[in-house]
Curated annotation (Swiss-Prot):
Subcellular location: Cell inner membrane
InterPro entries (alphabetical): Glyco_trans_51 (IPR001264), Lysozyme-like_dom_sf (IPR023346), PBP_transglycosylase (IPR036950), Pep_trsgly (IPR011812)
Encoding gene, per UniProt annotation: mtgA
Lineage of the species this protein comes from: Bacteria, Pseudomonadati, Pseudomonadota, Gammaproteobacteria, Lysobacterales
GO CC, any one term: peptidoglycan-based cell wall
NCBIfam families: mono_pep_trsgly
Class in the EC hierarchy, top level: transferase
Protein role: Peptidoglycan polymerase that catalyzes glycan chain elongation from lipid-linked precursors.
Membrane topology qualifier: Single-pass membrane protein
Biological process (GO), any one: cell wall organization
Key words of the record: Cell inner membrane, Cell membrane, Cell shape, Cell wall biogenesis/degradation, Glycosyltransferase, Membrane, Peptidoglycan synthesis, Transferase, Transmembrane, Transmembrane helix
Protein name in the entry: Biosynthetic peptidoglycan transglycosylase
Transmembrane segments: 21-43
Length: 243
């Protein structure tokens, strides 16, 4: 009799913990969706990537570290910037729903042939990671990135996705957003950037702390020229106006 009672008690305890876990999971999922809805209308004061950079600086005792971040509405950013970002990072941005499966397939194909596994993250995925998550590679983060990307694409128009991307992308150590980068590295505002300036900013995005916008090396000069050519082939800023 005692064994039956003990067994029933164990089953009851497991049920309680499963129910609690389910409730926590549902609340967390709901909160994440609410986050996405809020930032559809509210400009983010910070991103998780910025918070992570602060913590990294403090852990390294970089007490004088400063974050450079100035929000700038898309209407106040030169038209050359959005098309340069799309040309550099995600040329199918107007057409996909957050995931570019063609790019993923090509990346996996290159890797299977012995090549380096390059990222195939869309702009939407990068926004999800930079705004809500942490840096680094893990299946957990990738899974959460996919979750946030789905809701971002559902609730935000493409214009809003591109606006937030242009404002929270890192262009240098502690320098986030087109406005801050333009002022710090090019001595002008985001509204005054020409095609060459925009391409130069976009060229460093794969590794912004490694490359220098003010003193670009051969690779950045080459990539900047490539981005300008790609932007023109896409049709310039009209490529984004049509979609």
């Amino acid at each position: 009799m005692y064994q039956w009672i003990q067994r029933d008690s164990d089953v009851h305890q497991r049920w309680i913990w499963c129910r609690r876990l389910l409730i926590v999971s549902l609340v967390s999922a709901l909160m994440s969706v609410l986050q996405v809805i809020v930032f559809r209308f509210v400009d983010p004061p910070l991103s998780m990537t910025m918070v992570g950079r602060y913590l990294e600086a403090w852990s390294d005792r970089q007490w004088n570290f400063r974050l450079h971040y100035v929000w700038c509405d898309l209407e106040q950013i030169a038209p050359s910037v959005p098309i340069s970002l799309v040309a550099a990072e995600d040329q199918r941005f107007p057409f996909h729903h957050g995931f570019d499966f063609d790019a993923i397939k090509k990346a996996l194909g290159r890797h299977s042939r012995g090549g380096h596994l390059r990222g195939a993250s869309t702009i939407s995925q990068q926004v999800a990671k930079n705004l809500f998550l942490w840096s680094g590679r893990s299946f957990v983060r990738k899974g959460l990135e996919g979750w946030y990307t789905f809701w971002i694409e559902l609730f935000w128009p493409k214009r809003r996705i591109l606006e937030i991307y242009a404002n929270i992308a890192e262009f240098g150590d502690g320098v986030y957003g087109v406005q801050a980068a333009a002022r710090r590295y090019l001595g002008k505002g985001a509204a005054d950037l020409d095609e060459s300036d925009a391409a130069q900013l976009a060229a460093v995005l794969p590794s912004p702390r490694h490359y220098n916008i003010q003193h670009p090396g051969p690779y950045i000069r080459w990539r900047s020229s490539w981005i300008q050519r790609q932007a023109k082939q896409l049709g310039g800023s009209a490529y984004l106006d049509m979609h």
